[in-house]
Amino acid sequence: MALNSSADDGIKRIQDDCPKAGRHSYIFVMIPTLYSIIFVVGIFGNSLVVIVIYFYMKLKTVASVFLLNLALADLCFLLTLPVWAVYTAMEYRWPFGNHLCKIASAGISFNLYASVFLLTCLSIDRYLAIVHPMKSRLRRTMLVAKVTCVVIWLLAGLASLPAVIHRNVYFIENTNSTVCAFHYESQNSTLPVGLGLTKNILGFMFPFLIILTSYTLIWKALKKAYEIQKNKPRNDDIFRIIMAIVLFFFFSWIPHQIFTFLDVLIQLGVIRDCKIADVVDTAMPITICIAYFNNCLNPLFYGFLGKKFKKYFLQLLKYIPPKAKSHSSLSTKMSTLSYRPSDNMNSSAKKPASCFEVE
Protein backbone atom coordinates (compact mmCIF):
# COMPACT_ATOMS: atom_id res chain seq x y z
CA MET A 1 0.00 0.00 0.00
CA ALA A 2 1.74 3.17 -1.20
CA LEU A 3 0.52 6.18 0.77
CA ASN A 4 0.94 9.92 0.28
CA SER A 5 0.31 12.47 3.03
CA SER A 6 -2.26 15.19 2.44
CA ALA A 7 -3.53 16.94 5.55
CA ASP A 8 -3.80 16.72 9.31
CA ASP A 9 -7.22 16.78 10.96
CA GLY A 10 -7.02 14.79 14.20
CA ILE A 11 -6.61 11.60 12.22
CA LYS A 12 -4.03 12.20 9.54
CA ARG A 13 -5.44 12.23 6.01
CA ILE A 14 -3.49 10.53 3.25
CA GLN A 15 -3.81 9.45 -0.37
CA ASP A 16 -3.34 5.85 -1.52
CA ASP A 17 -1.45 5.69 -4.82
CA CYS A 18 -2.92 2.23 -5.52
CA PRO A 19 -6.33 2.30 -3.81
CA LYS A 20 -7.49 -1.06 -5.17
CA ALA A 21 -4.31 -2.99 -4.32
CA GLY A 22 -5.07 -6.05 -2.21
CA ARG A 23 -8.78 -5.26 -1.96
CA HIS A 24 -10.51 -8.37 -3.27
CA SER A 25 -13.78 -9.87 -2.10
CA TYR A 26 -12.25 -13.32 -1.65
CA ILE A 27 -9.54 -11.87 0.61
CA PHE A 28 -12.20 -10.29 2.83
CA VAL A 29 -13.78 -13.72 3.30
CA MET A 30 -10.81 -16.10 3.20
CA ILE A 31 -8.42 -14.26 5.53
CA PRO A 32 -10.88 -13.71 8.43
CA THR A 33 -11.84 -17.38 8.13
CA LEU A 34 -8.18 -18.44 8.30
CA TYR A 35 -7.55 -16.08 11.22
CA SER A 36 -10.50 -17.62 13.06
CA ILE A 37 -9.19 -21.15 12.47
CA ILE A 38 -5.69 -20.15 13.61
CA PHE A 39 -7.18 -18.50 16.70
CA VAL A 40 -9.21 -21.54 17.76
CA VAL A 41 -6.51 -24.12 16.98
CA GLY A 42 -3.73 -21.95 18.42
CA ILE A 43 -5.51 -21.07 21.67
CA PHE A 44 -6.52 -24.69 22.24
CA GLY A 45 -3.15 -26.21 21.31
CA ASN A 46 -0.89 -23.72 23.07
CA SER A 47 -3.04 -23.69 26.22
CA LEU A 48 -2.69 -27.46 26.40
CA VAL A 49 1.08 -27.14 25.91
CA VAL A 50 1.28 -24.68 28.82
CA ILE A 51 -0.79 -26.98 31.05
CA VAL A 52 1.22 -30.09 30.13
CA ILE A 53 4.64 -28.48 30.59
CA TYR A 54 3.83 -26.51 33.74
CA PHE A 55 1.49 -28.81 35.64
CA TYR A 56 2.34 -32.30 34.36
CA MET A 57 6.04 -32.05 33.52
CA LYS A 58 6.68 -29.54 36.32
CA LEU A 59 8.97 -27.31 34.23
CA LYS A 60 12.15 -29.15 35.20
CA THR A 61 14.41 -28.82 32.16
CA VAL A 62 15.93 -26.11 29.99
CA ALA A 63 14.07 -27.24 26.87
CA SER A 64 10.74 -27.16 28.69
CA VAL A 65 11.39 -23.56 29.78
CA PHE A 66 11.93 -22.48 26.16
CA LEU A 67 8.85 -24.38 24.95
CA LEU A 68 6.67 -22.91 27.70
CA ASN A 69 7.75 -19.39 26.76
CA LEU A 70 7.20 -20.19 23.08
CA ALA A 71 3.62 -21.21 23.82
CA LEU A 72 3.04 -18.09 25.96
CA ALA A 73 4.38 -15.83 23.19
CA ASP A 74 2.00 -17.49 20.73
CA LEU A 75 -0.94 -16.99 23.10
CA CYS A 76 -0.14 -13.28 23.37
CA PHE A 77 -0.24 -12.99 19.59
CA LEU A 78 -3.39 -15.08 19.22
CA LEU A 79 -5.31 -12.68 21.45
CA THR A 80 -4.88 -10.00 18.77
CA LEU A 81 -6.17 -12.17 15.90
CA PRO A 82 -9.90 -11.43 16.38
CA VAL A 83 -9.08 -7.74 15.91
CA TRP A 84 -7.33 -8.40 12.59
CA ALA A 85 -10.11 -10.75 11.49
CA VAL A 86 -12.71 -8.02 12.03
CA TYR A 87 -10.50 -5.43 10.32
CA THR A 88 -10.10 -7.61 7.21
CA ALA A 89 -13.76 -8.62 7.15
CA MET A 90 -14.64 -4.91 7.18
CA GLU A 91 -12.57 -4.50 4.00
CA TYR A 92 -9.59 -2.91 5.77
CA ARG A 93 -11.63 -0.33 7.68
CA TRP A 94 -10.24 0.10 11.20
CA PRO A 95 -12.95 0.70 13.85
CA PHE A 96 -10.92 0.23 17.04
CA GLY A 97 -9.01 3.48 17.52
CA ASN A 98 -5.33 4.38 17.48
CA HIS A 99 -4.29 2.70 20.75
CA LEU A 100 -5.52 -0.75 19.77
CA CYS A 101 -3.95 -0.26 16.33
CA LYS A 102 -0.57 0.14 18.00
CA ILE A 103 -1.09 -2.69 20.51
CA ALA A 104 -2.32 -5.21 17.94
CA SER A 105 0.51 -4.32 15.55
CA ALA A 106 3.08 -4.65 18.31
CA GLY A 107 1.60 -8.06 19.16
CA ILE A 108 2.38 -9.35 15.67
CA SER A 109 5.91 -7.97 15.72
CA PHE A 110 6.53 -9.20 19.27
CA ASN A 111 5.49 -12.75 18.42
CA LEU A 112 7.71 -12.81 15.35
CA TYR A 113 10.85 -11.89 17.27
CA ALA A 114 10.08 -13.77 20.49
CA SER A 115 9.23 -17.00 18.66
CA VAL A 116 12.24 -16.85 16.35
CA PHE A 117 14.63 -16.01 19.21
CA LEU A 118 13.22 -18.83 21.37
CA LEU A 119 13.49 -21.37 18.55
CA THR A 120 17.08 -20.24 17.98
CA CYS A 121 17.95 -20.67 21.66
CA LEU A 122 16.22 -24.04 21.67
CA SER A 123 18.39 -25.20 18.76
CA ILE A 124 21.55 -24.04 20.57
CA ASP A 125 20.41 -25.79 23.74
CA ARG A 126 19.80 -29.02 21.82
CA TYR A 127 23.27 -28.78 20.27
CA LEU A 128 24.91 -28.35 23.67
CA ALA A 129 22.81 -31.07 25.32
CA ILE A 130 23.36 -33.66 22.60
CA VAL A 131 26.87 -32.97 21.30
CA HIS A 132 28.53 -31.59 24.46
CA PRO A 133 26.44 -32.89 27.39
CA MET A 134 29.29 -32.93 29.92
CA LYS A 135 30.96 -29.64 29.00
CA SER A 136 27.66 -27.74 28.88
CA ARG A 137 26.15 -29.14 32.06
CA LEU A 138 27.14 -26.15 34.21
CA ARG A 139 25.90 -23.66 31.59
CA ARG A 140 22.60 -25.36 30.84
CA THR A 141 20.84 -24.62 34.11
CA MET A 142 17.25 -23.63 34.85
CA LEU A 143 18.43 -20.22 36.05
CA VAL A 144 20.30 -19.55 32.82
CA ALA A 145 17.27 -20.67 30.78
CA LYS A 146 14.89 -18.40 32.70
CA VAL A 147 17.23 -15.41 32.47
CA THR A 148 17.65 -16.07 28.74
CA CYS A 149 13.87 -16.05 28.29
CA VAL A 150 13.57 -12.75 30.17
CA VAL A 151 16.23 -11.25 27.89
CA ILE A 152 14.41 -12.60 24.82
CA TRP A 153 11.12 -11.04 25.92
CA LEU A 154 12.88 -7.71 26.50
CA LEU A 155 14.60 -7.86 23.09
CA ALA A 156 11.33 -8.79 21.37
CA GLY A 157 9.63 -5.88 23.10
CA LEU A 158 12.41 -3.55 21.99
CA ALA A 159 12.18 -4.82 18.41
CA SER A 160 8.41 -4.18 18.52
CA LEU A 161 8.73 -0.52 19.53
CA PRO A 162 8.68 0.74 15.91
CA ALA A 163 5.16 -0.69 15.57
CA VAL A 164 4.09 1.21 18.67
CA ILE A 165 5.71 4.44 17.48
CA HIS A 166 5.06 4.44 13.74
CA ARG A 167 1.87 2.42 13.23
CA ASN A 168 -1.16 4.69 13.36
CA VAL A 169 -4.72 5.13 12.19
CA TYR A 170 -5.02 7.10 8.94
CA PHE A 171 -7.95 8.26 6.85
CA ILE A 172 -7.47 7.48 3.15
CA GLU A 173 -9.32 10.16 1.24
CA ASN A 174 -9.56 8.48 -2.15
CA THR A 175 -11.09 5.30 -0.67
CA ASN A 176 -12.99 7.03 2.15
CA SER A 177 -11.72 4.51 4.70
CA THR A 178 -9.83 4.50 8.00
CA VAL A 179 -6.86 2.12 8.12
CA CYS A 180 -4.27 0.94 10.63
CA ALA A 181 -0.98 1.20 8.77
CA PHE A 182 2.64 2.28 8.65
CA HIS A 183 3.11 5.56 6.81
CA TYR A 184 6.55 6.86 5.87
CA GLU A 185 7.25 10.37 4.68
CA SER A 186 8.58 10.23 1.13
CA GLN A 187 11.77 12.09 2.06
CA ASN A 188 12.58 9.68 4.90
CA SER A 189 13.91 6.45 3.40
CA THR A 190 16.09 5.42 6.35
CA LEU A 191 13.25 4.28 8.60
CA PRO A 192 11.45 1.82 6.28
CA VAL A 193 14.74 0.41 4.99
CA GLY A 194 15.99 -0.04 8.55
CA LEU A 195 12.79 -1.70 9.75
CA GLY A 196 12.59 -3.96 6.70
CA LEU A 197 16.21 -5.06 6.95
CA THR A 198 15.87 -5.62 10.70
CA LYS A 199 12.89 -7.89 10.10
CA ASN A 200 14.69 -9.76 7.30
CA ILE A 201 18.06 -10.14 9.02
CA LEU A 202 17.29 -10.22 12.75
CA GLY A 203 13.91 -11.90 12.35
CA PHE A 204 14.89 -14.54 9.81
CA MET A 205 18.32 -14.80 8.16
CA PHE A 206 20.53 -14.74 11.26
CA PRO A 207 18.30 -17.09 13.33
CA PHE A 208 17.91 -19.46 10.38
CA LEU A 209 21.68 -19.75 9.96
CA ILE A 210 22.07 -20.55 13.67
CA ILE A 211 19.25 -23.11 13.59
CA LEU A 212 20.62 -24.71 10.41
CA THR A 213 24.15 -24.86 11.84
CA SER A 214 23.02 -26.27 15.20
CA TYR A 215 20.94 -29.08 13.76
CA THR A 216 23.53 -29.88 11.09
CA LEU A 217 26.16 -30.35 13.81
CA ILE A 218 23.70 -32.44 15.84
CA TRP A 219 23.02 -34.66 12.85
CA LYS A 220 26.74 -35.11 12.11
CA ALA A 221 27.46 -36.05 15.72
CA LEU A 222 24.59 -38.51 15.93
CA LYS A 223 25.39 -39.93 12.49
CA LYS A 224 28.93 -40.66 13.65
CA ALA A 225 27.63 -42.30 16.81
CA TYR A 226 25.11 -44.45 14.98
CA GLU A 227 27.74 -45.52 12.44
CA ILE A 228 29.73 -46.89 15.35
CA GLN A 229 26.60 -48.75 16.48
CA LYS A 230 25.69 -49.63 12.87
CA ASN A 231 22.12 -48.42 13.47
CA LYS A 232 21.10 -47.13 10.02
CA PRO A 233 17.28 -47.04 10.54
CA ARG A 234 17.73 -44.81 13.58
CA ASN A 235 20.14 -42.62 11.63
CA ASP A 236 17.48 -42.17 8.92
CA ASP A 237 14.96 -41.14 11.59
CA ILE A 238 17.36 -38.51 12.88
CA PHE A 239 17.87 -37.06 9.42
CA ARG A 240 14.12 -36.85 8.74
CA ILE A 241 13.37 -35.13 12.05
CA ILE A 242 16.19 -32.61 11.69
CA MET A 243 15.25 -31.87 8.08
CA ALA A 244 11.64 -31.37 9.18
CA ILE A 245 12.68 -28.89 11.88
CA VAL A 246 14.87 -26.82 9.54
CA LEU A 247 12.52 -26.89 6.53
CA PHE A 248 9.48 -26.20 8.72
CA PHE A 249 11.09 -22.99 9.94
CA PHE A 250 12.41 -21.94 6.52
CA PHE A 251 9.25 -22.44 4.47
CA SER A 252 7.05 -20.96 7.20
CA TRP A 253 8.82 -17.62 7.13
CA ILE A 254 10.47 -17.14 3.74
CA PRO A 255 7.26 -16.07 1.89
CA HIS A 256 6.45 -13.43 4.50
CA GLN A 257 10.02 -12.14 4.54
CA ILE A 258 10.12 -11.82 0.74
CA PHE A 259 6.86 -9.89 0.55
CA THR A 260 7.88 -7.72 3.51
CA PHE A 261 10.96 -6.68 1.53
CA LEU A 262 8.85 -5.96 -1.57
CA ASP A 263 6.43 -3.92 0.54
CA VAL A 264 9.32 -1.75 1.75
CA LEU A 265 10.32 -1.12 -1.89
CA ILE A 266 6.75 -0.05 -2.63
CA GLN A 267 6.69 2.27 0.38
CA LEU A 268 9.94 3.86 -0.81
CA GLY A 269 8.57 4.36 -4.32
CA VAL A 270 11.17 2.04 -5.84
CA ILE A 271 8.26 -0.06 -7.11
CA ARG A 272 5.46 2.13 -8.49
CA ASP A 273 3.52 -0.39 -10.55
CA CYS A 274 0.05 -0.84 -9.02
CA LYS A 275 -0.18 -4.35 -10.44
CA ILE A 276 2.86 -5.38 -8.40
CA ALA A 277 1.47 -3.53 -5.38
CA ASP A 278 -1.76 -5.49 -5.79
CA VAL A 279 0.14 -8.79 -5.81
CA VAL A 280 2.10 -7.80 -2.69
CA ASP A 281 -0.91 -6.48 -0.75
CA THR A 282 -2.93 -9.56 -1.71
CA ALA A 283 -0.18 -12.01 -0.79
CA MET A 284 0.86 -10.33 2.47
CA PRO A 285 -2.07 -11.53 4.65
CA ILE A 286 -1.75 -15.01 3.13
CA THR A 287 1.95 -15.18 4.06
CA ILE A 288 1.03 -13.97 7.56
CA CYS A 289 -1.42 -16.86 7.86
CA ILE A 290 1.25 -19.36 6.77
CA ALA A 291 3.94 -17.96 9.07
CA TYR A 292 1.87 -17.52 12.19
CA PHE A 293 -0.20 -20.68 11.84
CA ASN A 294 3.00 -22.71 11.67
CA ASN A 295 4.39 -20.57 14.47
CA CYS A 296 1.44 -21.46 16.69
CA LEU A 297 1.96 -25.15 15.91
CA ASN A 298 5.64 -25.02 16.92
CA PRO A 299 5.13 -25.83 20.64
CA LEU A 300 3.05 -28.87 19.68
CA PHE A 301 5.51 -29.86 16.95
CA TYR A 302 8.53 -29.71 19.24
CA GLY A 303 6.66 -31.13 22.20
CA PHE A 304 5.45 -34.19 20.33
CA LEU A 305 9.04 -35.09 19.52
CA GLY A 306 9.20 -36.18 23.16
CA LYS A 307 7.63 -39.38 24.49
CA LYS A 308 6.80 -37.95 27.91
CA PHE A 309 5.10 -34.90 26.40
CA LYS A 310 2.89 -37.16 24.27
CA LYS A 311 2.09 -39.28 27.32
CA TYR A 312 1.04 -36.32 29.48
CA PHE A 313 -0.76 -34.63 26.58
CA LEU A 314 -2.93 -37.71 26.10
CA GLN A 315 -3.51 -37.88 29.84
CA LEU A 316 -4.74 -34.29 29.80
CA LEU A 317 -7.11 -35.01 26.91
CA LYS A 318 -8.49 -37.93 28.94
CA TYR A 319 -8.97 -35.62 31.97
CA ILE A 320 -6.38 -37.49 34.02
CA PRO A 321 -5.03 -34.96 36.58
CA PRO A 322 -1.29 -34.52 37.13
CA LYS A 323 0.31 -36.31 40.06
CA ALA A 324 0.89 -34.25 43.18
CA LYS A 325 4.58 -35.08 43.25
CA SER A 326 6.88 -34.21 40.40
CA HIS A 327 8.66 -37.00 38.60
CA SER A 328 12.31 -37.55 39.43
CA SER A 329 13.58 -37.82 35.86
CA LEU A 330 16.97 -36.20 35.44
CA SER A 331 16.75 -36.22 31.64
CA THR A 332 17.46 -32.99 29.82
CA LYS A 333 16.70 -34.15 26.32
CA MET A 334 14.10 -33.38 23.54
CA SER A 335 12.89 -35.97 20.83
CA THR A 336 12.32 -39.58 19.95
CA LEU A 337 15.93 -39.91 18.91
CA SER A 338 17.45 -42.53 21.13
CA TYR A 339 21.09 -41.69 21.59
CA ARG A 340 22.82 -38.81 23.29
CA PRO A 341 26.48 -38.93 22.31
CA SER A 342 28.95 -37.90 24.96
CA ASP A 343 31.91 -35.68 24.24
CA ASN A 344 33.90 -38.88 23.70
CA MET A 345 32.17 -40.54 20.73
CA ASN A 346 34.09 -43.75 21.27
CA SER A 347 32.13 -44.39 24.46
CA SER A 348 28.91 -45.04 22.52
CA ALA A 349 28.79 -48.81 22.90
CA LYS A 350 25.97 -48.76 25.41
CA LYS A 351 22.27 -48.90 24.56
CA PRO A 352 20.93 -45.61 23.18
CA ALA A 353 18.99 -43.20 25.38
CA SER A 354 16.51 -40.57 24.25
CA CYS A 355 18.08 -37.29 23.17
CA PHE A 356 15.31 -34.91 22.13
CA GLU A 357 12.92 -35.38 25.05
CA VAL A 358 11.46 -32.31 26.76
CA GLU A 359 11.54 -34.11 30.11
From Swiss-Prot:
Its main location: membrane. Gene3D superfamilies: Rhodopsin 7-helix transmembrane proteins. Belongs to the G-protein coupled receptor 1 family. A lipid is attached at C355 (S-palmitoyl cysteine). It is found in: Cell membrane. SMART domains: 7TM_GPCR_Srsx. The keyword Transmembrane helix applies. Receptor for angiotensin II, a vasoconstricting peptide, which acts as a key regulator of blood pressure and sodium retention by the kidney. The activated receptor in turn couples to G-alpha proteins G(q) (GNAQ, GNA11, GNA14 or GNA15) and thus activates phospholipase C and increases the cytosolic Ca(2+) concentrations, which in turn triggers cellular responses such as stimulation of protein kinase C. Residues 56-61, 126-141, 217-239, 305-359 are cytoplasmic. C-terminal Ser or Thr residues may be phosphorylated. One of its GO terms (molecular function) is C-C chemokine receptor activity. Disulfide bonds join C18-C274, C101-C180. Keywords: Cell membrane, Disulfide bond, G-protein coupled receptor, Glycoprotein, Lipoprotein, Membrane, Palmitate, Phosphoprotein, Receptor, Transducer, Transmembrane, Transmembrane helix. Signal peptide: none annotated. The gene is AGTR1. Angiotensin II binds at Q15, D17, R167, F182, H183, Y184, K199. The keyword Flavoprotein does not apply. GO terms for biological process: calcium-mediated signaling; immune response; maintenance of blood vessel diameter homeostasis by renin-angiotensin; neutrophil chemotaxis; positive regulation of cytosolic calcium ion concentration; regulation of vasoconstriction. Glycans are attached at N4, N176, N188. This is Type-1 angiotensin II receptor. Residues 1-25, 90-98, 166-190, 269-278 are extracellular. One of its GO terms (cellular component) is external side of plasma membrane.
